[in-house]
Design a protein with these regions (language model features):
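Amphipathic, non-transmembrane alpha-helical segments in extracytoplasmic/periplasmic proteins
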Residues: 1-5
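Charged, solvent-exposed interaction patches on well-folded alpha/beta domains
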Residues: 8-174
Length: 174
């Protein structure tokens, strides 16, 4: 089935005529939502369509998803760029899942038109511009610095955008 999330299936009969079916499902780790449609990806980067009867509770990445695929696409990303981008997102999601503090703090992961990531925290009005999906440890350390040094001095609602994608700096905008 083109819409299935089945990773592997085996069927066989025994000598007494009993039919045995073994199914292994794909486990989604992230959900992509764009104006082109929605898809899941598993830990290997395999992309498959959303299911009508079930929604997995996984991080949602929305916005300008840079994948040129149809709504019912099932397979690995088509180009080197798409593969690298999906791998970056999977690394990002894995980083969030391994760091409970950040997993609980991030409400939304949004993709800008240039493919860069913006995260929206559950608390506060600022949006954090992450840039490319790489160097997460450094970027989240800058977010910690923002809360540790800038918020106490300027106030919690002083900025709406905080860019942590630049090397060695935090750029705040009202």
């Amino acid at each position: 089935d083109k819409k299935s999330a089945i990773k592997k299936s085996e069927a066989y009969t025994t000598t007494d005529g009993t039919l045995h079916i073994m199914i292994s499902q794909r486990k989604p780790v992230v959900r992509f939502v764009s104006d082109k449609g929605g898809w899941y990806a598993d830990e290997t980067g395999f992309i498959f369509p959303l299911q009508k009867k079930f929604t997995s509770r996984v991080p949602i990445v929305d916005g300008a998803i840079p994948l040129d695929i149809s709504r019912d696409y099932k397979g690995l990303p088509k180009t080197k760029y798409e593969k690298a981008w999906v791998e970056g997102i999977l690394d990002f999601v894995q980083y969030l899942n391994e760091n409970r503090k950040w997993r609980d703090a991030v409400a939304q992961i949004h993709v800008e038109g240039n493919g860069h990531l913006v995260i929206v925290p559950r608390n506060g009005r600022e949006k954090f511009e992450i840039g490319r999906p790489d160097e997460f440890k450094k970027k989240f350390a800058k977010i910690e610095d923002y809360y540790k040094f800038i918020v106490p001095e300027k106030g919690a609602d002083a900025y709406t955008k905080v860019n942590v994608s630049f090397d060695g700096q935090i750029v705040c905008r009202k």
